[in-house]
Amino acid sequence: MTSTAAEPGSAERWGPLWGARADDWARTEDQQVPTYEEAIRRVGIEPGQRVLDVGCGSGVFLRLAADRGAKPFGVYASEALVAVARSRAPEADVRVAEMERLPYADDTFDLVTGFNSFFFAADMVAALREAGRVAKPGAPVVTQVWGRPENCTFEAMKRVVRRFMPAPPPDAPPPPELWRSARGDGGRHTSL
């Protein structure tokens, strides 16, 4: 599937869902800190590096990057969570944007991350290519997705939470599609 200007992007499709309970989502993101720390340990963040978090949520990773002296940037689908991220990491440049059409020049970032975000793209291949496009040559692109349902404790939580949330778009892709997309896009990706 290829995105066109007429098709809704990820922000338009998912922003209302994630923005509906922004403070609740923000509280749950703290559970991701061990994953974020492991990503930082593996790829490193140096002072002055430009770091982009695609799907930055409430800005926890942006805060960790800023604490290490990086210049953090983030994009997200929901204005409500962008506001939370801006308050958590005021030095970060955080904006609502489509991950399939990132508002940055080629070769801008020393590190691009996407924690549990790329599989929400309206066009995952386009989103992954965009991550590669804005990464400097040789810069890592770190992705994280949920595990296979049979190995993922998050699946149980999703079943409960699903009862209280609006339904996702009917054509939302399953997480395994991300891996097929990542293998075929020719980009530079580091997966956790």
Predicted regions and their residues:
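A short SAM/SAH-binding and catalytic strip from SAM-dependent methyltransferases
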Residues: 111-125, 147
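A short acidic, Gly/Pro-enriched loop at the edge of an enzyme's catalytic core
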Residues: 100-111
